[in-house]
Amino acid sequence: MPQSLPFSPAWLAFEEAVRGASHRGDHLRIIEGGGLSVDLTAQAYSPQLEAAGLALCEQQGFALARRQLFEGGEANWTEHRPAWHTALRAALPPPSVAKDILNERERLRRFVDEADARGAYKYVLHLGIGGSDWGPRLVARALRHQGLKREVRFASNVDSHAVADAMHQLDPHETLVIVASKSFTTTEPLANAEVAIHWLQNAGVADPIKQVVAITANVDAALDFGISPQHVFRFWDWVGGRYSLWSAIGLPIALAMGNNTFDELLAGAAAMDEHFLRAPLAANAPVQMALAGLANRSVMGFNSLAIAPYDSRLAHLVPWAQQLEMESLGKVATRDGSPAGVPTGPVVWGMTGTDCQHTFFQWLHQDTTGAPVDFIVCEHADHTYDHHHRLLIANCLAQRAALLRGKSFEDALAETCARVDDPSEARILAEHLVHPGRRPSTLIVLPRMTAHNLGALLALYEHKVFTQGVLWGINPFDQWGVEFGKALARGIIGELDKPSGMASADPSTRYWVDLLSRRS
């Protein structure tokens, strides 16, 4: 049974080891897993810290929790169900769910093959939100250099400007609309589906609903919506929204790039699953990333994690990771209801390189706190501008080295004295050139941007987050804060439609509901 962290023996030893560890990056630590290289050299390290991290995993019951994750145990204990997304990408799914998974995979494959054979649909309009949007959106952007069979557009926000932009210049007669919602009650995809169906109707499409596909765990609701059974693809309650890319939610990927590309994505994630399951914990990339994250957040007090993919194709990785990490770890209650007792999930933010260098890296280098950074880069590019790719890699490595190395006052003073005659002015200027250094970072290297490597990268982050949830003692598979906000929104929309005073609301909410209901 996991222990409350703050005063547990393994946590106290881990905390002491972090404070006593080297932060100079003088011990080369590179882990190979799932086809990726994960370089943790610039994270805190000592043999004592490595041992303390393994002891913490043992104390918190990590081995049992990992086994339950892969065997369909109650990993999501507050909702009393598994979190079995790993089964979706296994070549041979667990026997109890294999028939359902393989049948749905085959239905998906057949739908895509038949559409290809008929030359059906030039465009796909994917309507989801959160996990049903960010995963396929990320993959579609990251792999489009491989060529597209169909153009895919995404709309998620309930702001109808977004869906109007997505539909702009599409041919309604050649567009397949995908409505992706686990519950098939979520406001955003259903509201956008109504807009899309009206768009099809207004264009003279004879039977608009025939061009609509549903992906959901609530098949009955999709059928009630009017979608034909042949166009309803299923996933299950034990698949969390932010882990649903590996299910039928991946349909737009298969339609855009082919079934084989989606298969390779699953295979890459499965390869990282195997690494996570089999590799010793000291050489286990997700586990060691998780322990580094605990050291940074819960001991050294870093409030955030920056993600800097030095590849423009990974532009959507940051919001995908924001949802994965912050929706999974943005909580404090442990299994018995007591608080974790230490800082938990960090704020996740970032941008692709080299744009990020001209946006927020100044803060990373010289702010009083800074933040750990995950650098991500591909060894090989998929263009012919070799010099440009070398520039990209050089910038990535240089920024990481600068964050680690820093610049002392003495070095800065030697630099300023060489170009400023006045010693007093040289000393003042030198203060501005000091970089604290010893800022932690991780470097993740993909050999090339392929579906396999991308699948492995996403699974790496999934398993890191799972491990941190186990070590902090929190459930990474629920999202009660999201549900609370949704419930309040339902009450407010009722008031905007038919005001009654909202006596229980705060004064500001009452003011704006009253004002906007009268003006609308």
Swiss-Prot record:
Report the EC code(s) recorded for this entry. 5.3.1.9
Named in its record, the pathway it takes part in is: Carbohydrate biosynthesis; gluconeogenesis; Carbohydrate degradation; glycolysis; D-glyceraldehyde 3-phosphate and glycerone phosphate from D-glucose: step 2/4
Task: Tell me the GO molecular function terms.
Answer: carbohydrate derivative binding; glucose-6-phosphate isomerase activity; monosaccharide binding
Family matches, as InterPro entries = G6P_Isomerase, G6P_Isomerase_C, Phosphoglucose_isomerase_CS, SIS_dom_sf, SIS_PGI_1, SIS_PGI_2
According to UniProt, the reaction catalysed is:
alpha-D-glucose 6-phosphate = beta-D-fructose 6-phosphate
Q: Where does it localize?
A: Cytoplasm
Give the first-level EC class, as a single word: isomerase
> So what does this one do?
Catalyzes the reversible isomerization of glucose-6-phosphate to fructose-6-phosphate.
| Protein family membership | Belongs to the GPI family.
The protein's name: Glucose-6-phosphate isomerase
Q: Specify the species.
A: Bordetella avium (strain 197N)
Tell me the name of the encoding gene: pgi
